[in-house]
């Protein structure tokens, strides 16, 4: 059937890119090589085919994970230490609050809203778009836009290790830990500002213990993806 013919055509081209080019991170020569193959194929059916360059920061989007783990782990440790070093409670808790605010800012902006807030802190690369246009045979009434991506992604370990049964609880517990540590540091700072020493506050002690218990979860989340293993597909 015609549907099977087109499906086989798509499968053959995908297989060709995977075998001929292989793994291709965004902004690499391998990605461009794949795009050139696609451009040549598109020239057989389209009127205009162009390859346009643009700049990007390929490591920025997933960078919020490492940054968040560092900031929140440090904040949890500082909260814990404030109980044993009450004289340094203000700087410890103040820095801890600042770190969790920084972490939450990048989680919300980079991960939830796809804002490029981490781009200035990561390496810049040049990627490309393949733009193909097929002109109408008559009057233009509608435009159909089909888009995709030519690069291949880093391996998401959690997907292989356990699929949704591991991905969802790991991210969920990790985010609960981030929010709990943020609230704990802020509450502890308010208690200290109110005149209570961290050494005398059972609330600060309990909050610090719970926050520290989340640290193994934070470090486990660092294994979410493997930057050294890139997919072919």
Could you describe each region identified by the protein language model?
Residues 1-233:
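Secretory-pathway/membrane protein signature
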């Amino acid at each position: 059937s015609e549907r099977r013919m087109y499906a086989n055509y798509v499968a053959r081209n995908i297989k060709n890119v995977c075998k001929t080019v292989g793994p291709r991170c965004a902004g690499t020569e391998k990605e461009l090589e794949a795009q050139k193959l696609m451009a040549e194929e598109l020239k057989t059916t389209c009127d205009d085919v162009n390859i346009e360059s643009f700049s990007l920061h390929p490591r920025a989007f997933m960078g919020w994970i490492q940054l968040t783990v560092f900031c929140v782990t440090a904040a949890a440790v500082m909260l814990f230490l404030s109980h044993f070093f009450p004289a340094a409670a203000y700087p410890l808790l103040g820095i801890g609050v600042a770190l969790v605010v920084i972490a939450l800012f990048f989680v919300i902006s980079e991960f939830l809203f796809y804002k490029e807030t981490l781009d200035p802190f990561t390496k810049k690369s040049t990627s490309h778009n393949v733009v193909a246009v097929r002109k109408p045979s008559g009057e233009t009434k509608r435009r159909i836009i089909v888009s995709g991506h030519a690069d291949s992604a880093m391996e998401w370990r959690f997907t292989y290790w356990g699929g949704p049964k591991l991905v969802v609880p790991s991210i969920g517990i990790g985010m609960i830990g981030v929010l709990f540590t943020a609230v704990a540091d802020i509450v502890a700072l308010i208690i200290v500002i109110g005149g209570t020493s961290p050494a005398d506050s059972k609330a600060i002690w309990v909050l610090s213990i719970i926050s520290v218990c989340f640290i193994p979860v934070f470090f486990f989340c660092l294994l979410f993806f493997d930057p050294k293993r890139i997919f072919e597909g």
